[in-house]
């Protein structure tokens, strides 16, 4: 309504409806015991992304997936991505409404999450995780080709996009600008931090050059 002034009894109003709604929602969420577990599962999913991007970068143009440790890092990334994302999907609805553990499997809450930006991103992420499994197994058996590069590149970009386009930047008024910027940031962090993680797991095998790669 034009000219309406939003307020809440007992608080100082900012004069904007968005700020008031955000304030109320935050107070409701703070009452939920799911905040810490939800944050942990978000980190687990992000760690899975880092491992997958690290494997992608270090394996590019090589037969490095022949290495049991590198393949283990890739499969571990898929498992973490799936487990963290599905846990976030289940917990998100109850956390938003201030609910507890007894509310996580309520159909209404899960349905609300499924139709949100985050829910759609997680569903896409699950599909991409299955594709990661197939591609990792395929590239383990086949020699590297230009098609391998396309598969790896597309999967990496799309998986990172499920994080960038469901996070805070995608909710901004200039989401068309900030979401792609966040995607670039995630890609850069994933290539660097993920690469370091994979090196920590399989550094000796990579350094030996036994699989067509060298550091």
Mark where each language-model region is.
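Polytopic transmembrane helical bundles with strong interfacial aromatic enrichment
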Residues: 1-215
């Amino acid at each position: 309504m034009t000219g309406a002034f939003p307020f809440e009894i007992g608080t100082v109003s900012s004069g904007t409806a968005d700020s008031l709604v955000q304030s109320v929602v935050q107070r409701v969420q703070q009452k939920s015991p799911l905040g810490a577990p939800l944050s942990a599962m978000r980190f687990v999913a992000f760690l899975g992304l880092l491992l997958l991007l690290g494997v992608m970068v270090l394996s590019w143009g090589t037969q490095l997936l022949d290495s049991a440790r590198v393949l283990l890092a890739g499969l571990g990334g898929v498992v973490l991505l799936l487990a963290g994302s599905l846990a976030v999907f289940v917990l998100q609805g109850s956390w938003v409404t201030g609910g507890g553990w007894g509310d996580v499997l309520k159909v209404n809450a899960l349905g609300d999450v499924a139709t949100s930006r985050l829910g759609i991103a997680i569903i896409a992420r699950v599909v991409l995780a299955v594709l990661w499994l197939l591609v990792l197994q395929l590239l383990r058996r086949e020699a590297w080709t230009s098609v391998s590069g396309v598969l790896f590149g597309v999967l990496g970009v799309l998986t990172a996009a499920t994080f960038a386009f469901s996070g805070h930047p995608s909710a901004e008024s200039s989401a068309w600008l900030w979401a792609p910027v966040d995607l670039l940031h995630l890609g850069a962090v994933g290539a660097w931090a993920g690469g370091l993680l994979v090196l920590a797991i399989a550094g000796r095998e990579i350094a030996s050059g036994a699989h067509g790669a060298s550091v």
